[in-house]
A protein has these predicted regions:
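Intrinsic disorder/low-complexity signature
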Residues: 1-3, 66
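Long, amphipathic, charge-rich alpha-helical segments that form helical bundles/coiled-coils
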Residues: 62-98
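Alpha-helical segments in soluble extracytoplasmic regions
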Residues: 3-60, 97-120
């Protein structure tokens, strides 16, 4: 069972870092680029960067829908990060937390896809 938990945790962490990389790329393409640190930084540094990105999303000169996609991708990423972080504390409820983290990452990915599509249309 412990091996399964370790694998699921590792898979979720890998997905979290992949979505972070996508968020970082999209943020560089915004009308007012947002520079997020590379994905090799400390977890706290990444959390603070995504939180800051969420805070300044409203300052982007983009339509409401695109802004909502940016904010949603940040919030979903932060939510997944919180859920994945609970593994360290062995608080139980693994199955629903696994699924919630997966869905949060899926939501972030979908929002980033929408935002990337809007950015392509502007080119």
């Amino acid at each position: 069972m412990s091996d399964d938990r370790d694998k699921i945790g590792a898979d979720l962490l890998a997905a979290l870092l992949l979505i972070y990389t996508e968020l970082r790329e999209v943020c560089r393409e915004l009308p007012v680029p947002i520079q997020l640190p590379g994905g090799t930084g400390q977890v706290l540094e990444l959390l603070e960067a995504v939180d800051r990105c969420f805070e300044i999303a409203e300052d982007q000169p983009i339509p409401e829908d695109a802004q909502a996609d940016l904010e949603m991708s940040c919030l979903q990423w932060l939510t997944a990060s919180d859920l994945i972080g609970l593994y360290r504390h062995d608080v139980g409820g693994y199955e629903h937390r696994d699924r919630a983290a997966e869905l949060a990452l899926l939501g972030a990915e979908m929002s980033l896809k929408n935002l990337r599509e809007w950015l392509r249309q502007q080119s």
